[in-house]
Structures are given as C-alpha cells and as structure tokens.
Design a protein with these regions (language model features):
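Function-determining sites in protein domains
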Residues: 1-132
C-alpha cells in the first residue's frame, strides 16, 4: 500500500474544523496548496506505524467540535485492508505522532492509521491552519 502520508496529495479537498466550524478547500486552491505543503513538510520523514487507536463515531464527532482538526476528503474509497473515504487528524502542535482517523461507510469507526513524525512535531501544520 502507498504510504498514507503520500495519499494526501490525492485528496479532492481538505476540511478544517476550528471549534466545530468547518471550512472546506478544494484541490487546486491556494489554501489547499498551503495546507498540503505544511503537511508534506511535517510528514517528509514520518514513519507509518501499526494502528493502535480505534475510533468510535459518536465520540470522534463530539471531539471534533473542540480545537483544530484537519480532514482529507477523497473521491473514492482508498486504503486497501483499512479502507477510508476521509482521513481526520487532531491538530495539536506539540504532538510528535498522531492517529489518522478513518471515515468509511458513513462513520468514523474502527482502527486508525498512526504516523510517527520522528524528530518533528505538528507546529508547522497547526500554524498553517491557524493563519488561513
């Protein structure tokens, strides 16, 4: 399977949630390019790890109302053995790794992907999202 951090380039849009308020940026727009550049900088040396986290739809939707979240939206299902139509990430600047929560078949249910950022953290991405 293609690395999950590379698949972000295939998204048709990204959604940014700030305290529950969502803004969507379509592929090809300036803000989409900014987000993708920050994502690529952050994940350039990342290592995909086995999934430890499990998402429960109702809890994820409730948590998404707090703080800043980024969601990649795809035209078709991707991911093979862990399929997804969207990938949701909680943006917390000091995190050095994070779950990518899979949305499939109408909900955020099941195992997550995990990216270890190695020596990096999420500051670059969080700063980008803060200044859109």
């Amino acid at each position: 399977m293609e690395d999950i951090q590379i698949q972000a380039k295939e998204a048709r849009s990204v959604r940014v949630y700030k305290d529950g308020v969502v803004t969507e940026y379509e592929a090809g727009t300036e803000n989409f390019r900014r987000i993708l550049a920050a994502w690529e900088e952050m994940t350039s040396d990342a290592f995909q790890m086995p999934a430890f986290g499990v998402s429960i739809d109702a809890l994820t939707r409730e948590e998404r109302k707090k703080g800043t979240w980024l969601e990649f939206v795809f035209d078709k299902e991707r991911g093979g053995e862990l399929p997804f139509e969207r990938l949701l990430v909680a943006c917390i600047p000091e995190y050095r790794g994070f779950n990518l929560i899979r949305y499939t078949q109408g909900g955020y249910n099941g195992r997550c992907y995990y990216l270890d950022l190695r020596e990096k953290d999420m500051h670059t991405l969080c700063d980008c999202l803060e200044h859109l």
